[in-house]
Design a protein with these regions (language model features):
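Adenosyl-5′-phosphate
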Residues: 1-187
Length: 187
């Protein structure tokens, strides 16, 4: 949130907000239900510019041909006409797909929670071996240039102790500092 950004960043000046980037896609699906609006936004921002791009790069880097069966044009067109109530409700996601899957695979598999490709960053950042590397980066001149390092270290301490689950913020800042070091400090 804005308060947290002001607390962590030196010289923080709000520019474009994430809502500025997503607004055109919500406008595109104006009048649709909230789920359809989020799907439109995901299709145009997250899938194309993020997840599919990463999957493509990772598979090509390893000489693999990747297929995304649910993005087959016919499957996608069919799925886009499924009513929202058959997609999600307050307690379940992928309702139609799970129902179809239960006809051919065990229910416990069809009803399994989506896992994706989890990386245990949350746990790594509670392990002093890895947290120490992050802490070192949080106390560099580069970190000092952009961030209030006292706040960064407090955020890391809260995460390690289990008081707050800050892994996403810590990881994003750490990745920024690694990138900055690689492309601006070392060059």
């Amino acid at each position: 949130d804005e308060h947290r950004k002001k607390k962590l960043l030196k010289n923080y000046h709000p520019g474009k907000l994430p809502t500025d980037l997503s607004r055109p896609y919500f406008e595109l699906s104006k009048g649709q239900d909230a789920v359809t609006q989020m799907e439109t936004c995901d299709l145009n921002l997250w899938m194309v510019g993020d997840i599919l791009l990463k999957a493509d790069k990772m598979s090509m880097a390893n000489s693999l041909e990747l297929r995304v069966p649910f993005l087959d044009r016919k499957v996608f067109e069919l799925a886009s006409h499924i009513p929202t109530k058959c997609k999600v409700n307050a307690t379940q996601t992928k309702i139609a797909m799970r129902g179809a899957a239960e006809k051919t695979i065990p229910a416990k598999t069809a009803d399994k929670k989506k896992l994706g490709f989890p990386v245990p960053v949350r746990a790594w950042l509670r392990d002093e071996q890895y947290a120490g590397v992050v802490r070192k980066a949080f106390n560099t001149p580069a970190a000092e240039q952009f961030f209030r390092t006292k706040e960064l270290n407090a955020m890391l301490d809260q995460h390690i102790s289990g008081k707050r689950d800050n892994w996403r913020q810590i990881w994003c800042i750490f990745m920024f500092l690694v990138w900055y070091d690689e492309y601006f400090v070392k060059r």
